[in-house]
Amino acid sequence: MSFAVGQRWISDTESELGLGTVVQIEGRMVTLLFPATGENRMFAMAEAPLTRVIYNPGDTIDSAEGWGMTVDKVEELNGLVFYLGKRTDTGEDTMLRETLLEHNIRFNKPQDRLYAGQIDRIERFGVRYKAQLLRHKQATSPLLGLQGPRVGLIPHQLWIAHEVGRRHAPRVLLADEVGLGKTIEAGLIIHQQLMTGRAERVLVIVPDTLRHQWLVEMLRRFNLRFSVFDEDRCVEAFADHDNPFYTEQLVICSLELLRKKRRLEQALDADWDLMVVDEAHHLEWSEDEPSRAYQVVEALAEVVPGVLLLTATPDQLGHQSHFARLRLLDPDRFYDYQAFLDEEKGYQAVAEAADALASGIKLSDEAINGLTELLSEKDIAPAIRQIQAENLDEELRQAARDELLQELLDRHGTGRVLFRNSRASVKGFPKREFHSHGFELPEQYVTAMRVNAMMGGARTQEARVAQALSPERIYQEFDDNNASWWKFDPRVDWLIDFLKSHRSKKVLVIASRAETALALEEALRTREGIQATVFHEGMSIIERDKAGAYFAQEEGGAQALICSEIGSEGRNFQFASQLVLFDLPLNPDLLEQRIGRLDRIGQRHDVQIHLPFLKHTAQEQLMHWYHEGLCAFELTCPGGHVLFGEFKERLLSVLTGESDELDELMADTKARYKALKAAMEQGRDKLLELNSHGGAKAEAITASLSDADEDTDLIASVIRLWDVIGIDQDDKGENSIVLRTTEHMMYPTYPGLNEDGVTVTFDRNTALSRDDIALITLEHPLVQTGLDLITGSDTGTTCVALLKNKALPAGTIFLELIYLAETTAPKASQLYRYLPPTPVRVLLDKNGNNLSDKVDYDSFDKQLSGVNRHIASKLVNASQTMLHPLFAKGEEFAGEALETLTQDARARMESQLGAELSRLEALKAVNPSIREEELEHLRNMMQELSGYLGNTQLKLDAIRLVLVSHN
């Protein structure tokens, strides 16, 4: 190293000091002033960790006076460098002495950092390259948005999400039967729309009682942080914005809030991309008098591009209300109820033809004639011959059936806007077995109920029923010691005996009220020392997570989880199969919701439902009405809401003792239940169900996601990423790791990691059984954050490594260049599907030959070892003259790769979108539910994407200089 006063150097170990100036040379020591910070440093000249800063022709540099220049020529005089070129502001020829360079310097380009001695460790270079590859892999995945959520891989749910989530501004009705996961389907669609940029602002409208359930589901399953808006929140948000809805991107609110004129006006002005309405079957409509709730949703549906309506099965509440919901999605298409009925008659033939195809048997002449007439513009004779052939491979026959079914579906009046799965069409459900346990009414309750009746009071009929169904509540009103009821209640004795005789079983206990749940936990703990935990609405989300985790724990966990009605909303415990209903809710929907905590797809055992009840009370009467009238314990009851509405008055009269017509009520209920069930079964649309569960396509999506879950390379890459960043990883067993921030992290903060740490797993089954453990996939925010931190900074952009190989001459150099092919386009343009930021690797030998096709990255990387920054800087300086022509050669090779990439991307785009456009244009002639705006969107999209692809640029992202060593 030779030094001269006025030269500019940078510290290899303290690059944050900026550009230093040599101010003194004395003996073997040199002193530098770093003007940006005002600090001095003294170094021994022989081993100073310093790198000389000299720019090259073509670079743009700044002077200390604030003006910039483009370097044309570099000259040296008496050890100082002089830059000749043109000013960027005036265009004048000028000269700048290096002493007058701007002090606050940041080397952003990899070449600048390399020459300035800002050289990273070898593992950081590797993590950066892998991070770019992972981002590319994610962006090009056809299943983007489906892998990340903590949900079971259920084919029909994934199919609906895949089919709807990739549409522009989807407007659909999700009408699966209860227990089939409509909320999960909606969450998957929301997640997919957000990840792909098709949506950014989402409004979810739910009944008051479901706001918290949705908040928990969206956070725990989909890592989506929604905000619940009520009147108080709107008032509070007014300080930040005139329109409170603009203060958050993801909002959950109730219909009650939006009934207020001012709040509705604000919601209408809030530029939502997607609206989700849960329990949409409660939106009442008639042509003459639509309800206020319907009008609210209708007004929003007119201005929000994407709309998802979640509803009970379509005809559960009548055909007219089904039409009303379709009208919300597409008022131009569904404009008149009578016209809708007339059209339905027309495609009844389509459904019959689909039934014939789906049956799997030979087609009758009548069915063939029907298909030929329906598909008259196509030649279906070859497909018919394949279906009817005697000795044909079953796969070929099925392919022919599927082809015709798809053609029929495309002509189905509501095939694109309605998805409905029934338990009859979806496999994987357990049986339900009901066990009732009757006990005599304790004297204490008899006395309390007698006194309560004498005191009377102006209570509503429903309030009296609520008391009659929970006699412990009446007793508590007259008892100073509120908790003493459990000392004599025979249901508590039975529960204790049941738990003792089923010690190896996990048992979920549900009661109506939080007070009852807390009292039961105390009874189990104090009387028998049974390990139980509670779950109620007074607990925070984190407290509920801990309680759920304690219950899920196989060893040392709670045997029983005791939930209140509201506290259990949104939580499912499929790992348990024993359910105890300590009391009964009055509403059959709530009863189904309770049983649905265990009776879900993914439950591996038959669900055992136990009901301890008090004889000759309202409890016993309600149990008989549910069991014998609605079959509500052992079967799902999709018509329960309708039947409860029809028989509510008579039922309440029986339960309060005002009527003794229980037998007549049961007979009438049973007859009406059978009629409703038969009508619903007859109304099943096999073609619609075939489309809704996706068949072989759904199975293929599920298999792909299952394979992705088993990707050990991804797991290794993510763990390596966290290692390099400096995150502490503590293996806790049971497939779980605890992640914690550390003082030596590369970055000051890591969003998503708090002081207590986060427990994570790469195993989907573990995550599904434990609400407190996050499922790590490529889509999880904790992985995305790491990728963003690495690729968004200059971490790993430069590296110097040694290759120990005696077959090559010592000192031989290789230059590994990682380019990014990228273009700027709005996320909503979907450009990433065809050309996301794509790493292009070029490996050059000293003669400029590209070896990247012959030497793959991983095998090359394993042979390399790192060197410390000071030695690396010396090696770079010694190799500079050889590097300049290699960089030019590397750009040439990368340019050739870029041309191929853009050509392939354009061909893929035109092929995929062109085929979809042709298909939809052809279908529009036979199915009016194809919206013109969808076609126009596709045409515009193709034009825009072509322009974006033409602007694709190469950017050098990272450099690795490799030298052969024999030591």
From Swiss-Prot:
Residues 163-332 form the Helicase ATP-binding domain. Belongs to the SNF2/RAD54 helicase family. RapA subfamily. A motif (DEAH box) lies at residues 278-281. Transcription regulator that activates transcription by stimulating RNA polymerase (RNAP) recycling in case of stress conditions such as supercoiled DNA or high salt concentrations. Probably acts by releasing the RNAP, when it is trapped or immobilized on tightly supercoiled DNA. Does not activate transcription on linear DNA. Probably not involved in DNA repair. Pfam families: Helicase_C, RapA_C, SNF2-rel_dom, Tudor_1_RapA, Tudor_RapA. SMART domains: DEXDc (SM00487), HELICc (SM00490). The keyword Secreted does not apply. Signal peptide: none annotated. Keywords: Activator, ATP-binding, DNA-binding, Helicase, Hydrolase, Nucleotide-binding, Transcription, Transcription regulation. ATP binds at D176, E177, V178, G179, L180, G181, K182, T183. GO terms for biological process: regulation of DNA-templated transcription. Its EC number is 3.6.4.-. Interacts with the RNAP. Has a higher affinity for the core RNAP than for the holoenzyme. Its ATPase activity is stimulated by binding to RNAP. GO terms for molecular function: ATP binding; DNA binding; helicase activity; hydrolase activity, acting on acid anhydrides. It comes from the Bacteria. CDD domains: DEXDc_RapA, SF2_C_SNF. Residues 491-639 form the Helicase C-terminal domain. PROSITE patterns: HELICASE_ATP_BIND_1, HELICASE_CTER. This is RNA polymerase-associated protein RapA. It comes from Shewanella amazonensis (strain ATCC BAA-1098 / SB2B).
